[in-house]
Amino acid sequence: MTRCGWHTCTRVRPRMGETLLPRKASQHEFEPEEIRMKQEHTECPLLVSHNGIIILETFTANAKQATDFLIAIAEPVSRPAHVHEYRITPYSLYAAVSVGLTTEDILSTLDRFAKNTVPDTIVRFVRECTLSYGKTRLVFKGGRFLVEAATREVFDVLTGDAEISRLRAAGTVRDADARYVFEVRVDCIEQVRRRCIEIDYPMIEEYDFRDDVALRSLDMDLRDTVSIRTYQEVSLNKMFGNRRARSGVIVLPCGAGKTLVGITAMCTIKKPCIVLCTSGVSVEQWRQQVLAFSTVSADAVSRFTSERKEMFEADAGILITTYTMLAFSGRRSAEAQRVMEWLRGTEWGLMILDEVHVVPAAMFRKVVSAVSHHCKLGLTATLVREDDKIEDLNFLIGPKLYEADWQDLSMQGHIARVECVEVWCDMTAEFYREYLGQDPRRRRVLSIMNPAKFQTCEFLIRKHEALGEKIIVFSDNVLALRTYALKLGKPFIYGPTGQTERMRILRQFQTNPAINTLFLSKVGDTSIDLPEASCLIQISSHFGSRRQEAQRLGRILRAKRRNDPGFRVYFYTLVSKDTEEMYYSRKRQQFLVDQGYTFRTVTALEGFRDTDVRVFRGKAEQRELLATVLLASEEDLESEESEDGDEAAADRRHLRTRGGAEDTVPASRTRTERHLLFRKMHKRHRR
């Protein structure tokens, strides 16, 4: 019998909107309770509310230990300087037990740090979630898929279930640790997993890579000159426990070394690895860093992109490709089809999903199930989307294993300190008159091409170039991108730019002292490593996407000079006054505000009035620019599509709603599409 990963041979796929957590947790109702403060409450860092909200005072004596504990059991909501807000959810408790915490561990530690008596409804909620969580594990071991039960009672519940019994393989065995174990058929793994959720015993997925002798080992270690930081080590310890590899997601800020975490995971497992990226540029950068940080040979690292279709010849190796290459369902070239057949026929010990927040999008959902693999590691800086589909990661990949605090890493010098500035640009009278009478798409482009915004962008570029800094300018709209870049004489990269040309422009930006400004479309949002950049100017964006705001900020967080005394990077957002841009700008900033960043609003830049700006100063030039927008085709008015197809669709619906064309709930699912857990949660929030 040919072995294969559980995602290749399954016959039943998970349905959208399916409950991902046990019924007990999803049906729990938080009951209001009076807060009862302890006598020694001033010395304790936590205030625990009856609705699952936990407030952390960062200035108390035990704040550091309490923070480490909360990261393990709760979801961070907001983390400004002195007071943090967390929320306990079924997902966060699922993640807690997956890394070894027990019910009593959670309750006793929560009580020790709490200012008040932990509400009874929270105690019941934790018990309901955790008493059955972590009691079953799906383990790939010795060429078989085994379900391990923690106790005889749990074993009897599982084997006594009619549906699970039907899906079992012949025979029941005990492993060396005397756990109760039974084997399940390879083609039924997903059905068993879903059934365990339905009967209140969600499984933790693990890969016993040390005892996997069937898969050839990969000769790969970290180079002696490479050292990992403390927070990277902590995140990896969450993944590798009990001498096995857990599937899950690690959340680190942009520039904090997510790639090195992934490479270290490869070196630990030492089995064939497949890495999924968002673009061809990130494929090249992943390959460069794998070879720079590890001892693996170049022949063992292959690429599968539109321009390179390689297959390593060794028994074990690394394949780096893009989500799009795997998700493509159209006709392929003979060469690409040959690589796809080889890829599908190969067993992968580890699948790394870079920028994992894109995986739940409609075009990528099938990627995870297209390849035979035994362990999944998701990497991202922003576990947030505008369409609620981030919830699906718990089903597609696994629980969140670790999430770092952006401000902590900034204070330690691991990522740069940032000054965030929102610059309000007056609309010229002629542009604003047309803005009021146009359809939503053309209004949006008019606000982007506002001559005052053009002049502000030119002023900021000249100012920071004079300081010897490298500048990135972002625009989602391609018409604006080309117009700005060509008018200011700067290079630009967008969707149609070929892979070879992209790499050439990026190299010039990094190494040529004469090329100090680069214009990027959405293709630069993620996975492009430009540590030379220390200033970012955003002239247009993707509606209210919090994820995109954080990803773009991340392009300058890894600045090489971040540890220089007094050094900081600059993040400018240019907004046309009295337009929809002002509404969306506030929405976009929310994630970064929750991470402790502050935005300074400026209506007049210092020195701007005294500077001889060169672009669109005359009325004739401004009218010509206005005519360009008014005569632009519908295609030119569209923003460039991103990988987050579903998120983009949600925000377009929102734009139409605000324009009066459609009556929909913006960026959300219908009630029936939500997981049961979240239907109840949203109902409570509405009340």
Curated annotation (Swiss-Prot):
Enzyme Commission number, as recorded: 5.6.2.4
Coiled coil regions, renumbered to chain: none
Helicase ATP-binding domain span: 239-401
Region (Disordered): 636-687
Record field: compositional bias (Basic residues): 677-687
Keyword Kinase: no
Keyword Nuclease recorded: no
Gene3D superfamilies according to UniProt: P-loop containing nucleotide triphosphate hydrolases (3.40.50.300)
Residue numbers covered by motif DEAH box: 354-357
Catalytic reactions of this protein: Couples ATP hydrolysis with the unwinding of duplex DNA by translocating in the 3'-5' direction; ATP + H2O = ADP + phosphate + H(+)
Compositional bias ranges of the Acidic residues kind: 636-648
Pfam family, one: ERCC3_RAD25_C
Compartments where found: Nucleus
A single GO molecular function term of this UniProt record: ATP binding
Binding site for ATP: L252, P253, C254, G255, A256, G257, K258, T259
GO biological process: nucleotide-excision repair; transcription initiation at RNA polymerase II promoter
A GO cellular component annotation in the UniProt record: nucleotide-excision repair factor 3 complex
Subunit structure, as described in the record: Component of the 7-subunit TFIIH core complex composed of XPB/SSL2, XPD/RAD3, SSL1, TFB1, TFB2, TFB4 and TFB5, which is active in NER. The core complex associates with the 3-subunit CTD-kinase module TFIIK composed of CCL1, KIN28 and TFB3 to form the 10-subunit holoenzyme (holo-TFIIH) active in transcription.
Family stated for the protein in its record: Belongs to the helicase family. RAD25/XPB subfamily.
NCBIfam families with a match to the protein in the record: rad25 (TIGR00603)
Function: ATP-dependent 3'-5' DNA helicase/translocase; binds dsDNA rather than ssDNA, unzipping it in a translocase rather than classical helicase activity. Component of the general transcription and DNA repair factor IIH (TFIIH) core complex. When complexed to CDK-activating kinase (CAK), involved in RNA transcription by RNA polymerase II. Also involved in transcription-coupled nucleotide excision repair (NER) of damaged DNA. In NER, TFIIH acts by opening DNA around the lesion to allow the excision of the damaged oligonucleotide and its replacement by a new DNA fragment.
Protein name in the entry: General transcription and DNA repair factor IIH helicase/translocase subunit XPB
